[in-house]
Amino acid sequence: MDVLKITPRGYCYGVVDALTVAKRAARDESIPRPIVVLGQIVHNRYAVEELDRHGILTLDGPDRLRLLDEVPDGATVILTAHGVSPAVRERAREKGFHVLDATCPDVTKTHVLVRERVAQGYHIVYIGTPGHPEPQGAMGEAPAGRVTLVSSLAQANTVDLPEGPLAIMTQTTLSQWDTADIIAVLTARRPDAEVHNEICLATQLRQEAAVKAASGVDVVVVVGDPRSNNSNRLVEVVEKVGGTPAYRVETADDLRPEWFTDARRVAVTAGSSTPSQITRAVIGRLESWNVATVPDA
């Protein structure tokens, strides 16, 4: 069995920037303590545990506004790479917290776009994953009733599309193929809609590389946290677009030999929030199973 290491894989620049903000804060003794991250800074528990070793506390939960009530007075609050709504920012200011913003620049771009189009009278159709913090933050830029979340092709066919200017926007970590299908349905219903496909370049490149590699292997392993949207989408695109069985693992201990019983070639990739040492351990485990490594894709 050969192992193909797909590139690019692992941390994107948005994740690197977010972790840099947090670690720099930990080193800066002038910053108020405690330092608290409002939600997981990125969706990977090993990245969160690393911050814990730097003395940074993570408060996690589905409602960022409620999490602020758990932050001690006088603390420093770090906003995660996924972004937050204006209501969260305002509440943090009201409570007097020292706020550090680790929002990914690509996510910030979408926030700005939502604000601009709402000010111009547009209704926003946002394609995203329900319950994920990125859509929650971006959609929070629009007043109630001015934004609609669409998460599936079926919903795209039936969702109410209000009259007047309409702008379609997307979460940055979706499957580019599924998103294209949803956009096609929406624009068929509303040819006048303005489309802004905000899937980030890092997500696109990782998905395209994984699909390309899938055509030449028997199994693809995606290393990523269960909560990582981009990792889960990598599994989906490999199976749906690449036509190859794919498995997501959090660590090397999740690997199952029976997945590779008839496999002669295996490819490994990782989500954009997966630490490289975790991916290396997965590759090392596979190599220990009688593997001859081939060059990177």
Each model region followed by its residue ranges:
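The feature marks the mature, well-folded catalytic cores of soluble enzymes
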Residues: 1-297
